[in-house]
Amino acid sequence: MSHAIELKKVSKYYAGESGVSMGFARVDLSLDMGEFVAITGESGSGKSTLLNVISGLDNYDEGELFVFGEDTSGFQTEDYERYRKTYIGNIFQDFNLVNSYTVYQNIELVMLLSGRKASECKERITELIELVGLTEYTKTKASKLSGGKK
């Protein structure tokens, strides 16, 4: 059985006026469906670069990256867009919330922008809010939430 995401000796480099700098080198990583992963490290250690490569927002220079056993080296923009929409979710250090919207409205906005019909959203939004333990904050504006709740 193949992993949801698998990196084999993946590297990312940046070329600049002062030469080549390394984003990260020879990373081996396997992620399975439903697995929760936290990438940690010092500032400048390549965490964001790695996540951008995994999500297809940036390319890699060496190695192999597989999505459910499929080699991504031939992926086109449309393939990465489909992959991100279906399988990838990032949580950013700086919150990307509309402060004047409620918890419910923020989730609804993301779902509508990703192409879902409003009629499909209500039940799923309620499930997601329950899943993360924010049921009592459903109608609370994002600006009133603590950092942890955001």
For each feature predicted by the language model, list its residue ranges.
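A short, flexible loop at the N-terminus of ABC-type nucleotide-binding domains that lies
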Residues: 2-4, 13-26
